[in-house]
């Protein structure tokens, strides 16, 4: 993905502007070093270092019209989720200051603590399989810790007042948002695929509704949001995509490579998946790759053939299941 296209979407600030935000929160801005961090598809992120004391600043986009609907106006939710993670001793940043007033910045921003470590995605290919297996086991344990938080109602942070009777309604709404976003930019998903997706959801309504745990679920613990240190998980970053939903919406259940790590399953404590669970996982895989395709189209990042090939594979897999 071209970096300049991503930069055009993100709400980047000058060093002087960041110093003003920092001073407003911490009372001074002496001797700070500001580093723009890469990665992510939504927010601009900076590392601010004051004589070795590091904090991270995240700034939401000022124009969210090019974001998929489910990702709009959710930095407030990340702040709330980081507060919640503190109560379960989760390796996440601690929220330090959240501001959505618009006084110093036209969009919401969040200061949080810094977690040492290197990006797992960027270093995974250099790790031995045994280390990767151990990390995936840890990811399972951590994902399960979040999902231990239960609730009786579904919740989508971008639509906090929306009510859902069951998982079929919840998942169908997510797909409807995506498909409407796709239609708004005349996205070509292939012959009849708009209708096929809706038919798949209807066909598997019973499987979608056969859920045992409605829990807080981190839908975006993918390798790019994982930090490692000394071959262990040191932290998870990005907490805007947590929903109260089916626990199988946790990302590592439905990674887009079409596989579910056995070590993740062991760490999560769910080694056996019944047929309905396998079907839901495939539906969630389809959702994730469709989300990536629509996101790239909305932001004019380009068309990536591998995404469309993956999407076609997900469609074929779901139409073959009996």
Give residue ranges: language-model regions:
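Basic, amphipathic N-terminal segments that precede the first structured/catalytic domain
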Residues: 3-13
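ATP/Mg2+ or Mg2+-diphosphate-binding catalytic cores
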Residues: 6-8, 292-322
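An alpha-helical support segment within catalytic cores of ATP-dependent transferases
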Residues: 13-29, 131-137, 144-218, 266-269, ...
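ATP-binding pocket architecture of kinase catalytic cores
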Residues: 35-170, 187
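Conserved catalytic motifs of the protein kinase core domain
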Residues: 52, 107, 212-214, 232
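Short beta-strand segments
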Residues: 58-59, 96-97, 155-159, 216-219, ...
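Active-site Asp-x-Gly
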Residues: 214-217, 222-282
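Hydrophobic alpha-helical segments that form the core
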Residues: 282-291
């Amino acid at each position: 993905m071209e970096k300049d296209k991503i930069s055009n979407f993100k709400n980047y600030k000058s060093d002087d502007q960041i110093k003003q935000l920092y001073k407003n929160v911490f009372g001074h801005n002496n001797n700070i070093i500001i580093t723009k961090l890469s990665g992510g598809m939504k927010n601009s992120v900076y590392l601010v270092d004051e004589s070795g004391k590091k904090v991270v600043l995240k700034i939401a986009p000022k124009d969210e019209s090019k974001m998929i609907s489910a990702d709009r106006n959710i930095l407030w939710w990340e702040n709330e989720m980081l507060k919640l993670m503190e109560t379960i001793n989760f390796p996440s940043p601690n929220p330090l200051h959240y501001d959505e007033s618009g006084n110093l910045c036209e969009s919401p921003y969040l200061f949080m603590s810094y977690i040492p470590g290197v990006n797992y995605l960027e270093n995974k290919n250099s790790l031995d399989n045994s280390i990767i297996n151990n990390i995936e086991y840890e990811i399972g344990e951590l994902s399960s810790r979040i999902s231990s938080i239960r609730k009786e109602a579904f919740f989508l942070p971008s639509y906090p007042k929306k009510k859902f009777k069951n998982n079929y309604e919840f998942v169908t709404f997510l797909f409807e948002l995506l498909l409407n976003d796709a239609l708004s930019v005349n996205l070509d998903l292939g012959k009849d695929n708009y209708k096929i997706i809706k038919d798949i959801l209807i066909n598997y309504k019973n499987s979608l509704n056969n859920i045992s745990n409605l829990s807080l679920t981190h839908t975006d613990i993918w390798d790019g949001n994982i930090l490692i240190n000394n071959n262990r998980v040191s932290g998870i970053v990005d907490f805007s995509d947590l929903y109260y939903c089916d626990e199988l919406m946790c990302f590592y259940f439905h990674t887009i490579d079409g596989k579910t790590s056995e070590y993740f399953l062991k760490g999560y404590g769910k080694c056996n998946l019944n047929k309905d669970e396998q079907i839901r996982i495939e539906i969630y895989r389809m959702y994730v790759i469709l989300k990536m395709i629509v996101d790239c189209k909305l932001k004019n990042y380009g068309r990536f053939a591998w995404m469309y090939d993956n999407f076609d594979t997900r469609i074929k897999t779901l139409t073959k299941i009996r």
